[in-house]
Amino acid sequence: MMNSFFDKMGEKLMPFASKVSANRYLNAIKEGFFGVMPVIIVGSLFLLFTSIPINGYNELMTGLLGENWSQIFMVPYRMSYGIMSIYVVVGIARSLAHFYKVDTRESIVVSFIAIFMLTPVLVTEDGLKGLPLDNFSASGLFLAIITTCLAVEIF
């Protein structure tokens, strides 16, 4: 009885699943995130090292590495999660460039230019200008995905 249920579900869902798997944008997004997974795993390990819930762990690490030991481990975390959108842009642009048979480097550069054009420039009270890194973290993923797909499509 269960086999017949799964067979019927397979018959109903297979056409939809094959259409979804053939979509170039979903494939590009999938490949972009697959490429980012090792970076995310490494960043997660460093974040884990800063917050292990064992009694005496913080004191041990402070004794070994000094008062600001957690900041040492947060640098790799910020370089992975903090700029995750940049890594995803490279993966998506690369995948779409292969699909359209255009130059990969040019597609990545065009995508970066589009992302930077949409990123607001912050001006501090001192008059210093800079890009907010929050837009390149996980909170900027949606904008990065849409912008990259559009930029490579137009390119």
Name these PLM-found stretches:
Residues I41-E67:
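Interfacial/capping segments of alpha-helical transmembrane domains
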Residues M1-I40, T62-F155:
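Signature of multi-pass transmembrane helix bundles
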